[in-house]
């Protein structure tokens, strides 16, 4: 998504929803229509003095509440534009540090143990100091134990994608002993344990009582009522932040400050996204208390070609936030020479309709 002001200055963002609603009840097809027919006309009809005002104006339209990822396809572009107007990088605009670089964090998918070891070894050799491993009940212990033996000091995060349940408590306790930084979304929300407890957040709270490792919440929190239920359990203290999921930069920033005020741990997760979205998350990693490196890795982890220039590349596990040629805003521009021949559709929405 690209926005343009009266002076021809532009800002960019990215919609990261999926083709199906497996992650959130929102799809790329729906979001395309919502951005075109609803969000773009609303934004064009408003006057903003600061990009923090955009999410508040969109919140006045109740029909948009169920489309946070669509809103996050537009709102960050206005932050990028504003950064170019005032001459500031996104990290500075949101209250982050003056850091020129951040540490990245890579993700390794589920695979045979030797393949996982090889992947982690390669990432460590590239300079990554934090790796998140996707895990499943049957192979988790073997894979994580092997990686921990190879790299005793590596910051290791585990993402179960809701694949475990209470019958695997022994496995989870053994994983806990391997000292991961957190275990993300361990429990299947549809499983009913012998105790009869059906509420997922209560179940996760009971699990947290058994582990020293933090249980981290992500896809289990979809609605405001989900958040209320989770926040009612004090020992659930770790949350993955994703800008698209919260509806843009300002809502994510608001949530970050709220969690910090409550003493919770927050860190920047990631999506199946290009360098445009990854740079937003990288900027948040400069905020106070963001002690875990974010899910920001080289664009080549997912794509043969990035959608932006300069392409998002990490060297020695580090990302330069704003290179000298792109010192403001997100720090990148769309690679239109690459995008134009690969585009399926292109729509321009203007104040003239």
Regions inferred by a protein language model and the residue ranges of each:
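Metal- or metallocofactor-binding catalytic centers and their adjacent structured scaffolds
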Residues: 4-85
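Catalytic domains of carbohydrate-active enzymes, especially glycoside hydrolases
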Residues: 123-131
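Conserved, mostly hydrophobic/aromatic
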Residues: 1, 8, 39, 74, ...
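N-terminal small/glycine-rich loop or linker at the start of catalytic domains
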Residues: 85-109, 143, 152
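Predominant activation on well-ordered alpha-helical scaffold segments within soluble catalytic domains
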Residues: 33-40, 75, 79-80, 145, ...
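A generic structural signal for well-ordered alpha-helical segments
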Residues: 82-83, 208, 259, 285
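Flexible C-terminal active-site loop/helix
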Residues: 272-353
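Catalytic core of soluble alpha/beta enzymes
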Residues: 133, 138-277, 306-307, 314
